[in-house]
Each structure stands twice: as C-alpha cells, then as structure tokens.
Amino acid sequence: MAPPHFLLVTFPAQGHVNPSLRFARRLIKRTGARVTFVTCVSVFHNSMIANHNKVENLSFLTFSDGFDDGGISTYEDRQKRSVNLKVNGDKALSDFIEATKNGDSPVTCLIYTILLNWAPKVARRFQLPSALLWIQPALVFNIYYTHFMGNKSVFELPNLSSLEIRDLPSFLTPSNTNKGAYDAFQEMMEFLIKETKPKILINTFDSLEPEALTAFPNIDMVAVGPLLPTEIFSGSTNKSVKDQSSSYTLWLDSKTESSVIYVSFGTMVELSKKQIEELARALIEGKRPFLWVITDKSNRETKTEGEEETEIEKIAGFRHELEEVGMIVSWCSQIEVLSHRAVGCFVTHCGWSSTLESLVLGVPVVAFPMWSDQPTNAKLLEESWKTGVRVRENKDGLVERGEIRRCLEAVMEEKSVELRENAKKWKRLAMEAGREGGSSDKNMEAFVEDICGESLIQNLCEAEEVKVK
C-alpha cells in the first residue's frame, strides 16, 4: 500500500520555511508519509534550505516568484511577487497534482502556510483535502478568526486580562499601514469561515494553549509543535555552527551561570537609530555581560523610514563602550546560545520561533515586540506563561533606556526566581510534547489517520517498525 503523499507549500521566508521543513520531517518520520515540499526558487538561492536533501520520502518542487535572487525592497516589488506567487504557484501545484494523479503516489492532501490564499483553492479544484499550517500561536489565529467573523469585540481567555490595542497583531490595529497584509489575512479567514470543520495544524503544544486550541468547536485545531530542531528534544546540541561560533562560545564559557543577557531581534526586525542608542545605553549602564546579535539587514524588505544606515553602522559611535561590557556578533546559533548555562535573560522581539525557543530551553525574557503577532506573543509571555517582562513604549513609540534597564533588572534580579521557576515548568512541558512519541507526534498521527483512514496509518506504522528493526 502506497504511503500518503502530502503536498506542502510554504511562503518564501525563513520564518515560514524552517517550521514547515521541520513539520515535513516529523510527518515523514512518524507516519512514513511522502512529502513534496513546494516553495520558490529564491529559497534555494538564499540557502534557506540545508541538510534536507537526503531525507528519505522528502522531495522538492520549485517555482519562480520573479525574484529568484531575492532583492525585494519596495512596495512595487512585493506587489509583483504576490502576483507571481499566485499565478506561478497555482500552475506548479496544478501541474504536479495532474501529473501524479494516475501514478503510484498521487497527492493525498495539500498543506499550506499563511499568505498563500490561492493554495487551498487549488486543492478544492482537484477535490483534495487541505490543511493550514499556522506558524503562529493558536491565540493569534483565534484573534484573526474572531475579527473577520465580524466580532470586533475584545477576545478574552482565562488567566489572561482583556487584550488592549497594544496586545493585538499589528495588522489589526488602527495604526496599521500594511493594507496588503490585512487583506491577505481577511481573505484567508473568510475562506476558512466558509469551510466545514477546517483543519488547522498549529505550531504550539497542547499544554501551552489548551483554551485557545478548543475555542472554536467548528474548527479542527491540531497542535503539532514545538516545530524546532530535533536535537533539542533528543538532548544533543547541534554543533554545526558558523565561523564566529568559537569566539562567542568561548566567551560564554568564561561567564558565570545565568549572568549573560542575550539580545537578538531576528533577521526581519530593524531598530531605529534612536532605539538602537537607547538599548545600547541601557546595556552599557547596566554593566552586565551581554551577547548582542546585529545581523546584516541591508537586503531587508522593511526599512526604518528615513534611515539608510544598517544597524551595525548605527552603533559605530559607541561600539567601543559596548564591547567593554559585552560582545557583538553578526551571527550565532541561537539554540546553542540559549542552551548555554551562562545565559540568564533573552531580550527578544517575540517572533514565534524565538518565543518557542525561549520556552523550550527555559530562558526568561525581556519581551520587546515590534509588529505582526509579536505583541500578542509578548502578552502571553508576561501574563499567561509568566516567563518574562514586557517593555513599555513612551508616547512617541520609543522604549527608553530607563525602561529597558527596569525590565533587565526585573528578569536578572527582582523577579528572577519566579520567572526561572516558570521557565523550568514550561521547558519540561515543551520537552514532553515535542519528544518522539509525545503529544504532538500523537496529534500528527491522528491528523494523518483522519485524512487517510485508520487502516492505512496502522500499516504504515508497522512498516516503519520493521524498517527500524
């Protein structure tokens, strides 16, 4: 009996590609399924995919978004890419489904990530089941779903105070200027609202968001996370790091336990020159050792209005002072750093992957959200999971150095015992969910069984056991 064949299409951005690939690998390992991973040529040109080409039952299909070498920087570029994604992506999926339907391994189900609203329509055209792989928390999905159902009232959950405007995904706030993102979420949610019991695969775990995962009885929400590298759950640290790793790991080795502040805002978020200076001054004045990752964002899609300097150029005037207290690197293995005994605090933009990593590795945070789902993630970290302290902006939207120092001292001193105890609790629960045979593996098996039938999944699991023996 042929294994089920999943067509998994993902938006061409690192924050979408990484969890999607991890989901694909876990799906294959746990159920013996075949996965064809579909994305843009640019993903391969920009080296977003590594160490996946030799995975059995995992193959790749690419199409062009018109920007094969990247370089998207203007609104017009993004509009053009959106059109190309829809036209070329639709054709690539349709041609593949058509070409395989009478062969040994026809497509069983189509899985897609956010911002690809045309993908489930292809599945519907070919009468295939589809599922959305939601790479943000379940609560954020619920906020969007509730909003576009026409209920604009405040969304509430037990143990979480009412959401203020500052807690909402930025695309739903009155100050949102990204109409394209708002329209994309609206189209996606309106499609799902019309579906009968749509399946949403969510990068979370059962014990982290139990209320949010069961908020809508008409939606089949399946927790399949945390979608993080398997090394975390097996207990082995990934040592395949880049050139700078020896310098920062040796530096961390020289520090005492829980004494270092790790600062990283990911690859997409860029701080203004004023904000960079306030953060730098807070770190200098605090006199605690820190490791600050400042990446090259010269090819970023979103730039700070009126500023052409890179972040590394913005700190030039006080870099010497910074390096007297801490260390600045252009890249590090975040998982390796967060796993290090010396790290006691993570200053993060609260992207969902970074948020999950902080929970899984048990590191308290200073939540410094910027846009998209990050404000909601920060709310959850501070109030629901109680593993961090969130910064507050002034009336001009700037987080001042005094506020940053307040939060750092709270995490490193005043609330350190409470926050670390909570972080340990979530680390244990996350490990239980993410380990082989944990709740997320079981949820994944149930999803495949639901799609393909109970007898097929039993046969596949038995075949996998024989193969292992």
Curated annotation (Swiss-Prot):
Knockout or disruption consequences = No visible phenotype under normal growth condition, but strong reduction in 4-aminobenzoate glucosyltransferase activity.
Molecular-function annotations in GO: indole-3-acetate beta-glucosyltransferase activity; UDP-glucose:4-aminobenzoate acylglucosyltransferase activity; UDP-glucosyltransferase activity; UDP-glycosyltransferase activity
Q: Tell me which Gene Ontology terms the entry assigns under biological process.
A: para-aminobenzoic acid metabolic process; response to salicylic acid
What job does the chain carry out? Answer: Possesses low catalytic activity on indole-3-acetic acid (IAA) in vitro. May transfer UDP-glucose from sucrose synthase to callose synthase for the synthesis of callose at the forming cell plate during cytokinesis. Has high affinity for 4-aminobenzoate. Catalyzes the formation of 4-aminobenzoate glucose ester which represents a storage form of 4-aminobenzoate in the vacuole. Is the major source of this activity in the plant. Also active in vitro on benzoates and benzoate derivatives.
Q: Which domain of life is it from?
A: Eukaryota
State the name under which the record lists this protein: UDP-glycosyltransferase 75B1
Say which species the protein is native to: Arabidopsis thaliana (Mouse-ear cress)
Q: Which gene encodes it?
A: UGT75B1
Q: Where does UDP-alpha-D-glucose bind?
A: Q334, H349, W352, S354, E357, D373, Q374
